[in-house]
Design a protein with these regions (language model features):
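Transmembrane-helix bundle segments that line or gate the permeation/cavity pathway
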Residues: 33-146
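Long, contiguous internal "core" modules enriched in hydrophobic/ aromatic residues
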Residues: 3-5, 10-14, 114-276, 287-290, ...
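TerminUS-proximal long segments
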Residues: 103-107, 277-279, 288-362
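Non-cytosolic membrane-interface motifs at loop->transmembrane helix junctions
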Residues: 21-26, 56-58, 182-194, 258-261, ...
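Hydrophobic alpha-helical membrane-insertion segments
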Residues: 65-84, 232-240, 300-307
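Alpha-helical transmembrane segments and their helix-start/interface "positive-inside/aromatic belt" motifs
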Residues: 22, 56-71, 153-160, 224-230, ...
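Hydrophobic cores of alpha-helical transmembrane segments in multi-pass inner/ER membrane proteins
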Residues: 33-42, 72-76, 126-138, 195-210, ...
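Extramembrane terminal tails and long inter-domain/linker segments of multi-pass membrane proteins
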Residues: 1-15, 87-115, 145, 149-153, ...
């Protein structure tokens, strides 16, 4: 694209491409993760019929619907800034200088080319995602139907199928968003993304329940069970994070160590993210008395969500060469986060206002 004859405003926009790309990826990933994670927990509750799922089912459904704008933020960012986010894409989309060595212009679709951004395989991956999304939409309609419409066995089968599809979607998201940027690939990226999304979505659901507990039916919420689930997810996420780091360094894998080397200047942010997301919740949830207190669980969930946001910034900002001390790195993030947060908040509250939030206490 000819940037040489641009105006001052155009030059400024060109300079802001990378900060907005990092911000859009971070905000979009946490929004998409919460949306898919809430769908997973909703399906799990429909499959098992557990008491916690019955009480939180409408909260989870509202969160799944309310955080759909996060999916649009992620898709819009990737669509508008593809060659900024994925440097390898310039070799296939006619943006790079084709006279340079090893540059391949956009041409005939070739399935024999194994490159990540070969248009043929890109279309195949996007087609798979569309099919999976359509499948989840159909199952969502099944789960939202009245009980007298679908047989319980069919509802459980639909929930199980939707859980599998959701995990597949999160795995594809982890590979495409984290491992498809031309950087070093960590072997546990799909599992990492699944744990990240499930922890963030569960924290959001518990936080919403804690804030709305004074409504009718809120007194009967199973707080000890919810605290135990948060503890379990914190431990799972901590294990996955630590095991990946330990395997990478102690096995001395240079290709994978470069992922952490590139983010060395952001190590302070990662430490803060892990402390908020894992350490503080673990220390608080160790005490049974605190696991039974809604206010304590709400504070823990706030820490988890803040830590998840900081971790999302650590995932993408170093790859764009951004400095953590520069104000220009954080301004796009704040703007997108506030905009998406307001839209999601209105969508979430609007979805909850149409019916009773919690079932009647028995």
């Amino acid at each position: 694209m000819p940037w040489d004859e641009m105006t001052v405003a155009g030059t400024r926009l060109h300079e802001w491409r990378k900060p907005f790309a990092a911000a859009g990826m971070a905000v979009g990933v946490i929004g998409t993760g919460v949306c898919l994670g809430c769908l997973f927990w909703l399906c799990l509750s429909s499959l098992t019929g557990a008491g916690w799922g019955i009480t939180l089912r409408r909260v989870l459904a509202a969160a799944c619907w309310g955080f759909l704008p996060g999916v649009l933020v992620l898709a819009g960012t990737v669509g508008c800034l593809t060659t900024v986010i994925f440097p390898e894409a310039v070799r296939y989309w006619g943006v790079a200088d084709i006279s340079s060595p090893a540059v391949q212009a956009f041409g005939v679709l070739d399935l024999a080319d194994p490159a990540w951004w070969n248009p043929a395989w890109l279309y195949v991956r996007m087609g798979i995602i569309v099919v999976l999304a359509w499948s989840m939409a159909q199952v969502w309609e099944t789960l939202a139907a009245e009980k007298n419409v679908w047989q319980p066995s069919f509802r459980r089968g639909s929930a199980a199928f939707c859980m599998i599809v959701t995990v597949m979607m999160l795995g594809v998201l982890g590979i495409d968003m984290l491992a498809g940027t031309g950087r070093a690939v960590l072997s546990m990226f799909p599992v990492y993304m699944v744990a990240y999304a499930l922890l963030a979505s569960l924290a959001l659901a518990v936080l919403a329940a804690a804030c709305l507990r004074k409504l009718d039916g809120g007194k009967g919420l199973p707080w000890p069970r919810l605290g135990g689930m948060l503890t379990a997810m914190v431990l799972v996420k901590a294990y996955i994070t630590y095991s990946q780091y330990m395997i990478t360094w102690y096995a001395s894998l240079p290709a994978k160590m470069s992922f952490y080397d590139a983010a060395f200047s952001w190590s302070g942010l990662l430490s803060a993210a892990l402390a908020l997301q894992l350490l503080v919740p673990f220390l608080v949830l160790l005490f049974p008395a605190l696991r039974r207190r809604p206010s304590a669980l709400g504070a823990v969930c706030v820490c988890i969500l803040l830590g998840s946001l900081l971790e999302a910034c650590w995932m993408f900002c170093p790859g764009f060469g951004l400095e953590p001390a520069a104000w220009g790195t954080w301004l796009p993030l704040v703007l997108l986060l506030v905009a998406m947060g307001l839209v999601c908040c209105f969508s979430f509250l609007g979805a909850l206002s149409v019916r009773r939030v919690f079932p009647e206490s028995r």
